[in-house]
Amino acid sequence: MSDLNLLKSWNPKLVKNRKKVWEAQQQLVEENKKIKERQKEIEKERELDRYSSLIRDEDQKNVKRKTGLEWMYDNTSTALTENVDYLLGKKEITDTLLDLSGNNNKSEKSENQKQTIRKHYQGIEDVICSKTNHKNVDLSSDDPMAKFKAAKQAHLKTLKQNIQPTSHEYPVHKPLRGANSKRYDSGNGSRSNYKNSRYNNKYYRS
């Protein structure tokens, strides 16, 4: 009987599986070669740095290989050294330098004027004002909430103006002279006086 494992796709004895294993091994070998070559290059660079650091001669300082990281270790600024040279008299101040300094000052002033604009936020109003002679720009006209508040304040002012002070004086009612009063007067005097008295008269009760 033949081996049934040869029919399986995962069988390591198959030619296609052996080919895959061989290709993976070749890739690992190539990667190891590249890693070793890179390590050798790094070692050579380190040796060159060591040799260049050992050289102290002034003529060979400029020959030092530039790595692009010199600015990280450069603490001396050229501007300060130039200013010190002018103060000590080692260098002369010419008209061209004065013209350049004047142009630089003008450019700095113009930039400062552009940057003087500042914002003030006061609730709803956002007003941009500047230190120059420009008029202040009011942006509250575009805000619906500001319009609503302004209309509300105007309405309250009109209501206060329309309200008038009222007097709390009550009207005085005078007793009417009519048929009822004559009827009580024609009878007994005591009854008419009692009915027409201040406490029992209906006109005084109101």
Swiss-Prot record:
Keywords, sorted A to Z: Coiled coil, mRNA processing, mRNA splicing, Nucleus, Spliceosome
Protein name (database record): Pre-mRNA-splicing factor CWC25
Protein family per UniProt: Belongs to the CWC25 family.
Coiled coil: 17-63
Keyword Nucleus: yes
GO cellular-component term (any): U2-type spliceosomal complex
Subcellular location: Nucleus
Quaternary structure, from the entry: Associated with the spliceosome.
Residue segments, region Disordered: 165-206
Primary location: nucleus
Function description: Involved in pre-mRNA splicing.
Organism encoding this protein: Kluyveromyces lactis (strain ATCC 8585 / CBS 2359 / DSM 70799 / NBRC 1267 / NRRL Y-1140 / WM37)
Keyword Nucleus on entry: yes
Classification of source organism: Eukaryota, Fungi, Dikarya, Ascomycota, Saccharomycotina
GO biological process: mRNA splicing, via spliceosome
Lineage top rank: taxon: Eukaryota
Annotated Low complexity bias: 186-206
